[in-house]
């Protein structure tokens, strides 16, 4: 069934109701926090945010006798927005409840615009972003390239992961092989696995060990199945592909951090159908296409838009084969989607 379009008044009413609910929840949270801080709280200690639930988070103790134990924590009002992967300072209260008093500096931050265009962090302290795609739903180079630009912009190393490799057949193999060849030529690490059959999963595990990783990709590519295969003790529901759209149905409802037995962590985040890049500039996008590095700045005109201008280094690179047409198409699509003031 097609998604019903809402008019401006309906959207306003929905936002008003959601705002009122959020205000009531914040008021209850403030009262609970006052009660906690008025009682006996333990000493300050470091912790790791492993899940976020509205106005509360789950924190894993990182030191002392409680190390490894998980506590549901309230947040002081003066704290910035916390996300899974954040390192924090917190104090334990009674009955497994605690209070977060400070956020520790982040080494990296993965952000994306929300529905209103406001930047929203989705994961912190990640050093490996695993871009997951599959034969079905059909992978799109433009979406993969958006993730790559986001990874380069955030300073996070990317890994391209083709899941459901068992679904490769004579019909889709040529297009998939051509797609993967582009990224392998650029030097990006590419793995082909099947979470369902277990093929390639040990190789994937070795790539994840020792890192804080996040899986990103559109719904239906098997992110939850990958988590279940890597960590069988977890309980991540797997959703089917929509028969109407051929895309996946969302299963994971909150970003959650899991530990690997041999070290390293995995953040499983909700499915993302489209990764907006409205928060980056033209220069950021150009830097995100690594094959452009030696070409940018060498065009005849300083304000070259890399479209039809004479003496354009990118167009010359396209002719010479240094730049692939698929990547140039993605670049132009991303640039066209940027706000005009990003130029």
From Swiss-Prot:
InterPro entries: G_CP_dom, NA-bd_OB-fold, P-loop_NTPase, Ribosome_biogen_GTPase_RsgA, RsgA_GTPase_dom. Its cofactor is Zn(2+). Its EC number is 3.6.1.-. It is an enzyme of class 3 (hydrolase). The keyword DNA repair does not apply. It holds the Pfam family RsgA_GTPase. Zn(2+) binds at residues 299, 304, 306, 312. It is found in: Cytoplasm. One of its GO terms (cellular component) is cytoplasm. Binds 1 zinc ion per subunit. Keywords: Cytoplasm, GTP-binding, Hydrolase, Metal-binding, Nucleotide-binding, Ribosome biogenesis, RNA-binding, rRNA-binding, Zinc. GO terms for biological process: ribosomal small subunit biogenesis. Monomer. Associates with 30S ribosomal subunit, binds 16S rRNA. One of several proteins that assist in the late maturation steps of the functional core of the 30S ribosomal subunit. Helps release RbfA from mature subunits. May play a role in the assembly of ribosomal proteins into the subunit. Circularly permuted GTPase that catalyzes slow GTP hydrolysis, GTPase activity is stimulated by the 30S ribosomal subunit. HAMAP family: GTPase_RsgA (MF_01820). Belongs to the TRAFAC class YlqF/YawG GTPase family. RsgA subfamily. This is Small ribosomal subunit biogenesis GTPase RsgA. It comes from Pseudomonas savastanoi pv. phaseolicola (strain 1448A / Race 6) (Pseudomonas syringae pv. phaseolicola (strain 1448A / Race 6)). The gene is rsgA.
């Amino acid at each position: 069934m097609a998604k019903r379009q809402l008019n401006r008044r309906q959207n306003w009413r929905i936002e008003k109701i959601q705002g009122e609910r959020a205000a009531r929840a914040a008021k209850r949270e403030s009262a609970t926090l006052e009660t906690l801080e008025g009682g006996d709280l333990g000493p300050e200690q470091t912790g790791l945010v492993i899940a976020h639930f509205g106005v509360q988070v789950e924190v894993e103790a990182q030191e002392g006798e409680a190390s490894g134990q998980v506590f549901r924590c309230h947040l002081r009002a003066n704290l910035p927005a916390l996300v899974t992967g954040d390192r924090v300072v917190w104090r334990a209260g009674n009955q497994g409840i605690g209070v977060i008093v400070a956020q520790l500096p982040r080494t990296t931050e993965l952000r994306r615009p929300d529905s209103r265009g406001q930047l929203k962090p989705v994961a912190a302290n990640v050093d490996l972003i695993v871009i997951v795609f599959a034969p079905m739903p059909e992978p799109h180079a433009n979406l993969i390239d958006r993730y790559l630009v986001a990874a380069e912009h955030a300073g996070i190393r990317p890994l391209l992961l083709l899941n459901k490799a068992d679904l490769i057949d004579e019909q889709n193999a040529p297009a998939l092989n051509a797609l993967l060849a582009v990224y392998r030529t650029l030097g990006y690490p590419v793995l082909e696995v099947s979470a369902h059959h277990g093929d390639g999963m040990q190789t994937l595990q070795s790539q994840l060990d020792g890192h804080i990783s996040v899986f990103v990709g559109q719904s239906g590519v098997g992110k939850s199945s990958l988590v279940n295969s890597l960590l069988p003790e977890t309980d991540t529901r797997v959703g089917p592909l929509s028969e109407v759209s051929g895309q996946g149905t969302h299963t994971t409802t909150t970003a959650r951090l899991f530990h690997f037995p041999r070290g390293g962590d995995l953040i499983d985040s909700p499915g993302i159908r489209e990764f907006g890049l409205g928060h980056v500039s033209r220069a950021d996008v150009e830097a995100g296409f690594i094959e452009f590095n030696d070409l940018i700045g060498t065009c005849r005109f300083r304000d070259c838009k890399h479209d039809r201008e004479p003496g354009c280094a990118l167009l010359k690179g396209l002719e010479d084969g240094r730049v692939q047409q698929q990547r140039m198409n993605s670049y132009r699509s991303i640039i066209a989607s940027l706000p005009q003031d990003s130029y």
